[in-house]
Each structure stands twice: as structure tokens, then as C-alpha cells.
Amino acid sequence: MTSIAKAFVEKAISNNPVTVFSKSFCPFCKAAKNTLTKYSAPYKAYELDKIENGSDIQAYLHEKTKQSTVPSIFFRNQFIGGNSDLNKLRSSGTLTKMIAELKENKSSIL
């Protein structure tokens, strides 16, 4: 893990309302991004298999979140988990509320 990876992750989750660290070939990542798109969530995805230092970024995410798999999803600066966690939020109705809150406060987080 490098300080470059840490800086990249921290900047990404600070600058985006919703951040998804993903891999382009991962079906769980695709499902999570599809869910966020369906709910019109203002998200930014980073494909770790396509960017420089992707493995270092994933190592830092593991250190930060204790989750070794992708997707790693953040709402504002809060880690919410992976695709199964996103589906739990969707099923409970919480996801809709979280996205509405993000959109209402968009100017303060963008």
C-alpha cells in the first residue's frame, strides 16, 4: 500500500457523493452500478483493473474497510459495504432515502 493509493481513495470519497471502487469484469460490481444507475444516484466508479496503482488502491481499501472484495461503496465519506449491503439498503427502502438526501444536499458535497 502506498501513500499515493491512500491519497487517491481519500480524495475520491471526499469529492464524490457516491463512490464505487469496482473491477470491470466483476458481476457484483456491475450489479451495484446498475442499482445505483436505476436509482439515479450521483456516483463515480473507479475500475481498479483499469487504473494505475489499482492493486495498491484495493490493498488500501482492505486496510480501511476490512473488506477485501469489490465493489467497495461509499456514500459521502461513509463506507456502506458491497453489493449485498447495497441490496439490503434497497430492500429496506433506506437507499431511496439516502439518495434523496444526497441530491437535496448536492451543493454542499459537490
Curated annotation (Swiss-Prot):
It comes from Schizosaccharomyces pombe (strain 972 / ATCC 24843) (Fission yeast). CDD domains: GRX_GRXh_1_2_like (cd03419). Pfam families: Glutaredoxin. Disulfide bonds join C26-C29. It comes from the Eukaryota. The keyword Ion transport does not apply. NCBIfam families: GRX_euk. InterPro entries: GLR_AS, Glutaredoxin, Glutaredoxin_euk/vir, Glutaredoxin_subgr, Thioredoxin-like_sf. Keywords: Disulfide bond, Electron transport, Redox-active center, Transport. This is Glutaredoxin-2. SUPFAM superfamilies: Thioredoxin-like. The disulfide bond functions as an electron carrier in the glutathione-dependent synthesis of deoxyribonucleotides by the enzyme ribonucleotide reductase. In addition, it is also involved in reducing some disulfides in a coupled system with glutathione reductase. Thioltransferase catalyzes cellular thiol-disulfide transhydrogenation reactions. It transfers reducing equivalents to cytosolic protein and nonprotein disulfides. The keyword Signal does not apply. Belongs to the glutaredoxin family. Residues 6-106 form the Glutaredoxin domain. GO terms for cellular component: cytoplasm; mitochondrion; nucleus. GO terms for biological process: cell redox homeostasis; cellular response to oxidative stress; removal of superoxide radicals. One of its GO terms (molecular function) is protein-disulfide reductase activity.
